[in-house]
């Protein structure tokens, strides 16, 4: 399992995960990344999303229609910046991940998890077994 100590985070990773920051749109690692695999919490290594649920939303951040396991996601009311939104945090590391909106693809449930690349790590499909995520391979068998 991939894990990262909070002391090893770069400036943007720390800003996003620990200070509830947001990275710039269209200038982050995974906004336009569609390789087959999973996305895990940058700190805890817990699986959060698969490429099967990732979609192009034109918002500039990685977007997913659902999480792998709802028990790994915490949703909180966010009233910052004069808006009312739903913040998404990781259960295990309590890291800020991004926000969830109800403007996602209707055929996939209507949700759009808008996630900061700085809060997640991509694990390629062909490395799942080797890195301890082999139990997630069935998520790709349709």
UniProtKB/Swiss-Prot annotation:
GO terms for biological process: protein repair; response to oxidative stress. Transmembrane segments: none annotated. The keyword Oxidoreductase applies. PANTHER family: METHIONINE SULFOXIDE REDUCTASE (PTHR10173), PEPTIDE METHIONINE SULFOXIDE REDUCTASE MSRA_MSRB (PTHR10173:SF59). This is Peptide methionine sulfoxide reductase MsrB. It catalyses: L-methionyl-[protein] + [thioredoxin]-disulfide + H2O = L-methionyl-(R)-S-oxide-[protein] + [thioredoxin]-dithiol. InterPro entries: Met_Sox_Rdtase_MsrB, Met_Sox_Rdtase_MsrB_dom, Mss4-like_sf. The active site is at residue 114. It comes from Staphylococcus haemolyticus (strain JCSC1435). Belongs to the MsrB Met sulfoxide reductase family. It comes from the Bacteria.
């Amino acid at each position: 399992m991939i894990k990262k100590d909070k002391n090893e985070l770069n400036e943007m990773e720390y800003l996003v995960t620990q200070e509830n920051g947001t990275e710039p749109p269209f200038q982050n690692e995974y906004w336009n990344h569609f390789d087959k695999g999973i996305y895990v919490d940058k700190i805890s290594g817990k699986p959060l999303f698969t490429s099967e649920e990732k979609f192009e939303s034109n918002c500039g951040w990685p977007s997913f229609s659902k999480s792998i396991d709802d028990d790994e996601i915490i949703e909180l009311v966010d009233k910052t910046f004069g808006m009312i939104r739903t913040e998404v945090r990781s259960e295990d590391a309590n890291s800020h991940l991004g926000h969830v909106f109800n403007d996602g693809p209707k055929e996939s449930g209507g949700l759009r998890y808008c996630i900061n690349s700085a809060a997640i790590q991509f694990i390629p499909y062909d490395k799942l077994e080797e890195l301890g995520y082999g139990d997630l391979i069935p998520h790709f068998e349709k």
